[in-house]
């Protein structure tokens, strides 16, 4: 079964206010088995417009990734992010098919 992922790109406009989101999002992430694969760090954006923070979060499956976003726990955390940031989140199913160089 393919995993699910959140790909998030965010510009924080109020770091102090954003702390409310950080304090709350872990409740939903733990409930739905989330695991950070990328959480900030140095990056280069060779194409398109960059955001200052980039995150990739892995979930056990696509349905869990969707359920986490739609959960009351995450929606409560999100209410603390939206006034203090601008960004995008894409929720996507992983790929389990053949890879380059495989027979």
How does the language model describe each region?
Residues 1-53, 60-70, 93-103:
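Short S/T/G/P-rich N-terminal loop/turn motif that feeds into the first structured element of a domain
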Residues 75-91:
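C-terminal structural segments of small proteins and small subunits
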Residues 53-55, 87-88:
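Generic beta-strand structural signal
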